[in-house]
Amino acid sequence: MRVLTLNAGSSSLKAAVFEIQSVPQSGGAPCGQVWTADSRGDAGLVGDLLAPVLPDGIDLEYKTSPPIEVVGHRIVHGGTQLSDAVRITPSILDEIARVSEHAPAHNALALDVIRRTIALFGDDVPHVAVFDTAFHRTLEPAAFTYAGPLDWVADGIRRFGFHGINHEYVSGRAIALRDRPAESSRIVTCHLGSGCSLAAVHDGRSVDTTMGFTPMDGLPMARRSGAVDPGILLHLLRRGSHTIDSLDQVLNEQSGLAGLSGTTGDMRVVLDGMDAGDPRCRLAFDVFAHHVRKGIAAMAASMGGLDILVFTGGVGEHIPRVRSAICASLGFLGVAISPDRNLSAAGESELSDASSAAGVFVIPAEENWMIAQACVRVVSSSVR
């Protein structure tokens, strides 16, 4: 089956084409990729993002010989109604649009991409939505319920969690690399990129995570604040220094590493500033590392311990200094990494040294591969 996957971020679009012969097994390494492309730009200019990814030539090379048989789309927020990969229909599109207010930078772009690709490929090619929130559908009420009025839950206000496509992938790969059964594995996955989240994966199921009702919650990120005392927001509103819209802009675009350091929020720029003696960059780095360490400990507490720690995402995969700073104080969880392994890590790599009770790994994100697998499962089940 030839699958086209489209992974729309807030200002980027990644695409890949896979040839998959059968329904893949969980935890398997990516295979069958025959083409890939990505683009970045203004989130409002979807045509500009699509042009490099879906050039006119795709009609000749990938739509006709052999044809694309299914198109898969990453959707960040599925709300309470969309908790598994599903074939896209008009009613599914309506539901994705309904919950877009909770992830407007992501869902709105994905919807536009879906509509444009349906127009490109026509009605005969099925489209499948794969949700970042789906992996976290196994959270228990104690983990997903906010301690506000109970009717919040009835209104759909709860912890959803995000980055689930990648948390599911890297936890499955970690089990395979560690060569132990999922049923006895307590894994903390650290997705550290421009957006950051942790997940506790016990027995192959997500049992806790740091992002919440929206992707703004949890860890400090490149430009997002992560969790803040809600009293701060009430204080700023009462003082009249901010409106709801201006607070939205501050929390989503002017906070996190960018807000603390005065930079773009790129971790590499923060590290350069720190090395040059900039105290703001030092503070930004220390705040980030502190919250990630604290979050890892909290995730481990949700499972009663830690067997495997995984770093993934752009920062988690490519910046050894971040991994070293995070792991330095996690000895109480049985974490010890080899400095040499940490510095030389490339692709899937084990960082843990011989004294480490917990396995520590770097595992590159492979969201497109997970989307392709979900497409095959959805389409295969619909033709039985």
Model-found features: residue ranges?
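Short glycine-rich, Thr/Ser-proximal phosphate-binding strand/loop in the N-terminal lobe
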Residues: 3-44, 212
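Short glycine-aspartate micro-motif
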Residues: 3-5, 70-72, 128, 187-191
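Short beta-strand-loop/turn "lid" adjacent to the catalytic site in phosphate-handling enzymes
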Residues: 59-108, 126-128, 133-146
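Glycine-rich phosphate-binding loop of actin/hexokinase-like ATP-binding domains
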Residues: 137-237
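Phosphate/ATP-binding catalytic cores across multiple sugar-kinase/actin-like superfamilies
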Residues: 170-173, 177, 286-304
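A mobile "lid/hinge" subdomain adjacent to the ATP/sugar-phosphate binding pocket shared
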Residues: 239-286
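Glycine-rich phosphate-binding loops at beta-strand->alpha-helix junctions
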Residues: 307-329
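Structural signal for terminal/edge beta-strands and the immediately following C-terminal loop/tail
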Residues: 348-384
